[in-house]
Amino acid sequence: MKDILVVGKLKEGKFEKFMGFNNSEEGMNERRKIADVTKSLGTVSPDKSAVMFKIVVHDEDAMYSFLDGSNPVSKPIFDEVMESYEIFELNKI
C-alpha cells in the first residue's frame, strides 16, 4: 500500500457535483477498489475550485483509471467536473 496525495482542480461551479459522486454508493464502490477509504483524508480550497485527498492506495492502476477517464463509472462525472489533477507519492520521514 502507498500513501498518495491527489490534488484536483475543478471546473467552475462543479464542487457539489464532484462531492455528490464521491459520496454516492457508486462513487464509494469505485473508491474502495482503489484505496482504504477509512484512511482517506480530504480538504477543499475556500473557493471550492480545488480538492486535495491523501489516500492509502492498494491498486494504483485502478487509481489512474479512476482519474484519467478510462474507468467507465467515473468518466462521465470526471469529464464534467475535473479540469486537471496532480498525483504525488508520499514518503514518511
PLM regions and their residue ranges:
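Short S/T/G/P-rich N-terminal loop/turn motif that feeds into the first structured element of a domain
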Residues: 1-73, 83-93
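Short, exposed beta-strand-loop hairpins at the edges of beta-sheets
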Residues: 77-79
